[in-house]
Amino acid sequence: MFLAQEIIRKKRDGHALSDDEIRFFINGIRDNTISEGQIAALAMTIFFHDMTMPERVSLTMAMRDSGTVLDWKSLHLNGPIVDKHSTGGVGDVTSLMLGPMVAACGGYIPMISGRGLGHTGGTLDKLESIPGFDIFPDDNRFREIIKDVGVAIIGQTSSLAPADKRFYATRDITATVDSIPLITASILAKKLAEGLDALVMDVKVGSGAFMPTYELSEALAEAIVGVANGARVRTTALLTDMNQVLASSAGNAVEVREAVQFLTGEYRNPRLFDVTMALCVEMLISGKLAKDDAEARAKLQAVLDNGKAAEVFGRMVAAQKGPTDFVENYAKYLPTAMLTKAVYADTEGFVSEMDTRALGMAVVAMGGGRRQASDTIDYSVGFTDMARLGDQVDGQRPLAVIHAKDENSWQEAAKAVKAAIKLADKAPESTPTVYRRISE
């Protein structure tokens, strides 16, 4: 039997906590026997004193075990259970292509996703722009879809890592969100509850990233890889660029449209293609579906070329109560904005810099994201045809096409786009899409 205040005191004084102490505290968070004040105190001591790797693994596992951990053995699946998690960005629609692509190559992807957070778009919000799409199928239906289709993308249920929800809510109001051990445990508790064989992390770097500097993004990626492998889930991480909008679009319906176009081959943004392929390659290799980069890329390109990945996406949409002919007729089903009009720069020049975070917030301001949990989303608004770093813009080439609900909203968005995109006399040097791969 432990006392919560003694565990807090031990950590306050700079000592490492045992696995039993951490489990006692996390179970108390779940059972409401630990007060909010005690959660806040422990969070602050961890913020200042950090945690050792064994402590980080124990915290993550205790949070994972605070609820249901999915077990797939009874389904006798003939492939690995794999997933991807992104720290979030703008125009980051990779999940919608990656899940079907990896499933078409023999993997099983039980993806539990989130809503938009701050300036970043949420996969669930994007999918809900598809009429009828059910992000909360019951457990049996979720398992059926995974077995039959190979991929399902759903929302987090209250049974998965419930201690994390309460812990995070307290961190959010006590300035302890940005602690690497706590971020790591929060991300991985939910992902490891999926019962994975392998995981790839997409950790963003740049003006639209969750972490403010390259060094902090790198530290988070290294922490996640270390903890997940310590929890015996094969995990790698890629540091990918978020100094500009990743896709050509940013919003909800507009990104779903681009995802379908990507899968069918109608249009593939080169940077989005690079990042999506790189993440899929990691999943195939970690899941032992390919022996090396070359074999993985060949398999992935094949399922894009032969239409199998697009077919899997269509089957997933239908299985989750969306239209059965969505891939063929996406334009008919996705909502469109009242006003669609291009915004142009005031002067000619080359796009030299982009405040990606500000562009994400501009989508939120138009109604494409939430300022508070109770807000309803306008799925139709957003940006398409986004200019990229190095593009020459003038009276012919716009900075973006804005999809807005009315003229006022369009004017505000146009102002935000012009302020967020800097021009120069010459094009900047190109930056990589993937900066670094981190493995155990």
Curated annotation (Swiss-Prot):
Enzyme class per UniProt: transferase
InterPro entries attached to this UniProt entry: Glycosyl_Trfase_fam3, Glycosyl_Trfase_fam3_N_dom, Glycosyl_Trfase_fam3_N_dom_sf, Nuc_phospho_transferase, PYNP-like_C_sf, PYNP_C, Pyrmidine_PPas_bac/euk, Pyrmidine_PPase_CS
Assigned EC number: 2.4.2.4
A GO MF term: thymidine phosphorylase activity
Reactions the enzyme catalyzes: thymidine + phosphate = 2-deoxy-alpha-D-ribose 1-phosphate + thymine
GO biological process, one term: thymidine metabolic process
GO cellular component terms given for this protein: cytosol
Keywords from the named record: Glycosyltransferase, Transferase
Domain of life the protein comes from: Bacteria
UniProt signal peptide: none
Matching SUPFAM superfamilies: Nucleoside phosphorylase/phosphoribosyltransferase catalytic domain, Nucleoside phosphorylase/phosphoribosyltransferase N-terminal domain, Pyrimidine nucleoside phosphorylase C-terminal domain
PANTHER family membership: THYMIDINE PHOSPHORYLASE
Subunit structure of this chain's protein: Homodimer.
Job of this protein: The enzymes which catalyze the reversible phosphorolysis of pyrimidine nucleosides are involved in the degradation of these compounds and in their utilization as carbon and energy sources, or in the rescue of pyrimidine bases for nucleotide synthesis.
Family stated for the protein in its record: Belongs to the thymidine/pyrimidine-nucleoside phosphorylase family.
UniProt protein name: Thymidine phosphorylase
Taxonomic placement: Bacteria, Pseudomonadati, Pseudomonadota, Gammaproteobacteria, Enterobacterales
